[in-house]
Regions:
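Solvent-exposed loop/turn segments flanking beta-strands in beta-repeat/beta-sandwich domains
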Residues: 111-115
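Extracellular Cys-Trp
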Residues: 32-61, 189-192
């Protein structure tokens, strides 16, 4: 009789331990994700909009986006703050200053009252510059695009950051190319 009780206690303890392990593993799967859309592909995860992070149902009083499988007001990646896809690729002439406009969607009201920045990645370097939000467009301040390679063009991306710490990013980015006209005078940016 005591052996049956002991056996059941061991089984219950083991099950409770394993359940906690499964929950901890699921939590770790969420916390390592930095994209809203990717977060919502994991059934145990939710996206905290204000905190701009993926968690396992730990958003508190934050706006929460749930996976599409959950019946909720904000459910699925269509509610993720993101750069609008399908914008035409930008092409810049190396050495020229240009302003960039990025169309975004799913802007939550409180976001509009925070500072905005654009993060430009080109030539293996990251540059963060001031930006302004007007309606659903982010206007990045003028930036001198340079192709520092020996290639006719280099590619880069620009993404959108918001909040006072500038660590909260919209999903997605806008691609661009920077042409060296001395190596490729047929580049669209060189014929302007």
């Amino acid at each position: 009789m005591y052996s049956n009780i002991l056996h059941n206690v061991v089984l219950i303890t083991l099950c409770a331990f394993l359940f906690e392990c499964v929950l901890a593993t699921e939590k770790d799967k969420c916390s390592g994700v930095s994209s809203c859309a990717t977060c919502l592909t994991k059934t145990m995860c939710t996206w905290c909009v204000t905190k701009s992070r993926c968690t396992k149902q730990e958003c508190g009083n934050d706006n929460v986006i749930y996976p599409k499988s959950v019946v909720a007001l904000l459910s699925g990646p269509d509610f993720c703050p993101r750069v609008v896809e399908g914008q035409k690729e930008l092409v810049f002439k190396s050495g020229q200053r240009q302003k960039i406009t990025i169309k975004i969607t799913q802007i939550y009201l409180y976001m509009a009252f925070t500072p905005w920045k654009c993060k430009i990645n080109v030539n293996g370097k990251e540059h963060v510059i001031i930006a302004t939000l007007i309606v659903d467009n982010v206007y990045c301040e003028s930036f001198e695009f340079k192709n520092e390679s020996d290639e006719p063009y280099v590619t880069g991306t620009v993404s959108v950051l918001w909040d006072y710490e500038y660590n909260k990013a919209f999903d997605g980015s806008l691609p661009f190319r920077v042409c060296r006209c001395d190596l490729d005078d047929s580049c669209v940016a060189c014929t302007k």
